[in-house]
Amino acid sequence: TDVRVVLPTPDEPFYSDDTPWYRKDKRYQVLYLLHGAHGDCTVWTRNTGIERYAQKYKLMVVSASVTNSCYVDMVHGGKFFTYMTQELPAFIESTFPVSTRREDTFIAGMSMGGYGAFRLGLAQPERYSCIVSLSGAIDLVLQTRKTSVQMEDVFGDQPMDHTDNDNLWKLEQLIKQGVSIPKIYQCCGTEDFLYESNQNVRRKLEQLGVDFTYDEGPGIHNWDYWDPQIRKILEWLPLKGTLVDA
C-alpha cells in the first residue's frame, strides 16, 4: 500500500551556518493521520494545510492508504490492522528519526479514520498517548446499516458488538483491566450526519469517566470543517514545537 510522510525541514539558519540538518541525538514526535472511506494517504495533504502545520510544530505526520477496510484485517481483503499495528510502525521507526516514546506518539483520523484511530489506539494503548476522532464513525456497531462501505467484506457476517471491533466495549474492558487509556479528543460538526452518533459516544465516554475533550460547532462532513479542526487539535496535542531527545 502507499504511504505519505510529512517530514519537517530544518529552519532557515542552516543555510548560513554549519548546523547539522538532522541531529542523531534528536527525534520527531509523530502523528499517524488516518483517512476516511473512499480516501487514501494523500487526502490530508491535498485538502488541508497539514504540511505547513507540521512544519510549524516540527511534527512528523504519517498517512497510509487502507482502502475501505476500517483499519481492520478484512474478512475478504487486506490485513490492514496487522499492517497498521506492526508493519508500518516498524518501517517508520527503522527509516526515519522518529521518537518511539508513548508521550511523543499520537493517532488521529476523520470519518472512517475516526473509527480507525480508536480501533488502533485502543489495541495498542501502550504506543499512543492521544487518540483523536474528527467526525468519526467511532461506534460502527450503530453505523453498519448507514454506510456505503461493504461491511460484509470487512467484518464478515458475525456480530461486531462485544468484540475488539466494538470500540466502546473495548474501551470499557481496558478500563476494567486498569490499563492506562490514551487521552481522547472528539469533535463533530453539528450538521454532520454522524452528529447524533457522536453524541451517543460522548455520553458513553462521560459515563466511563475517561479523560477526553469534546468540541463541536457548525459544520458538515467535509474538509471545510476538518482543516480548521486539525489546527485546533495540534494545539491540544502535547507538542514540543521542536525535536525531542532520542
Regions found by a protein language model. Name each.
Residues 1-246:
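Non-catalytic cap/lid and distal C-terminal segments of serine-dependent acyl enzymes
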